[in-house]
Curated annotation (Swiss-Prot):
One Pfam family linked to the record: SAICAR_synt
GO terms (BP aspect): 'de novo' IMP biosynthetic process; cobalamin biosynthetic process
Stated name of the protein: Phosphoribosylaminoimidazole-succinocarboxamide synthase
Organism of derivation: Brucella canis (strain ATCC 23365 / NCTC 10854 / RM-666)
Superkingdom as given in the UniProt entry: Bacteria
Listed GO MF terms: ATP binding; phosphoribosylaminoimidazolesuccinocarboxamide synthase activity
Recorded catalytic activity of this chain's protein: 5-amino-1-(5-phospho-D-ribosyl)imidazole-4-carboxylate + L-aspartate + ATP = (2S)-2-[5-amino-1-(5-phospho-beta-D-ribosyl)imidazole-4-carboxamido]succinate + ADP + phosphate + 2 H(+)
PROSITE patterns xref list: SAICAR_SYNTHETASE_1
Length: 254
């Protein structure tokens, strides 16, 4: 499609003006970042895989009645989405101890949590996205108490769905991050799932081997990120079985 006016550029995506009022085009970049972009490389093919995987997940969420901003995929790197007012919070749902939770609480990575835990982080790169409580959220007006309830209800439903989806293809959903936005339809407003859900924003471990199939491969310098994302896509049925990773591995552009 013809390139339109750029609205916003983040670490992994660019938002462009959409073809119709109330729509945007979301472009998936090949940039891989970690630790709030303190670590950064460009990995050829990552954006294409995230676009396809996120499309698959959001299509399924829409199908089972979980509202999202997703309309349809336009091409290999772009999606048509509904324009929403993003709530400045990262919502993290944790099922297994890993990453910052394991470090913060002294838990062994891989420990199954007593129940799923929902955490909120304020979206501010300059502050390293600090963890915040519901008190912070309401005091600073980032979301109302009712909106927090709606966000938590969505998070629980998405977690239930994703846990089952990935379990069915031999993958354990360790944790994931999602974002929400306010979708205005006339005088009515509702909270919907926005941004993306992909191996960039979820920890995915092979159930049998515990191999990491997510962005931890980049965070921890393990290599094989594109191959891991391809494996997730293959198991989800959105890549042909005979598609194989390039023997030379992903191309890194410094």
């Amino acid at each position: 499609m013809n390139r339109r006016r750029r609205i916003y550029e983040g670490k992994a995506k660019i938002l462009y003006e959409g073809p119709e009022p109330g729509t945007l085009v979301q472009f998936f970049k090949d940039d891989a970042t970690a630790f709030n972009a303190k670590k950064h490389e460009v990995i050829d093919g990552k954006g294409v895989l995230n676009n396809r995987i996120s499309e698959h997940i959001f299509t399924q969420l829409n199908r089972i009645g979980i509202p999202t901003h997703f309309i349809r995929r336009l091409n290999m790197r772009e999606q048509l989405i509904k324009e929403v007012e993003i709530i400045p919070l990262e919502v993290v749902v944790r099922n297994v101890a890993a990453g910052s939770l394991a470090k913060r609480l002294g838990l062994e990575e891989g420990t199954i949590l007593p129940r799923s835990i929902i955490e909120f982080y304020y979206k501010a790169d300059a502050l390293d996205d600090p963890m915040v409580t519901e008190e912070h959220i309401t005091a600073f007006g980032w979301a109302s108490p009712q909106e927090i309830d709606d966000i938590m209800a969505l998070a629980i439903r998405v977690n239930d769905f994703l846990t089952g989806l990935f379990l069915g293809i031999g993958i354990q959903l360790v944790d994931f991050k999602m974002e929400c936005g306010r979708l205005w339809e006339g005088d009515m407003m509702r909270i919907v799932v926005a941004d993306e859900i992909s191996p960039d924003s979820a920890r995915l471990w092979d159930i049998t081997t515990n191999d990491k199939l997510d962005k931890d491969r980049f965070r921890r310098d393990m290599g094989g990120l594109v191959e891991a994302y391809q494996e997730v896509a293959r198991r989800l049925g959105i890549m042909n079985e005979n598609d194989t990773p390039r023997p030379s591995g992903p191309t890194l552009v410094k």
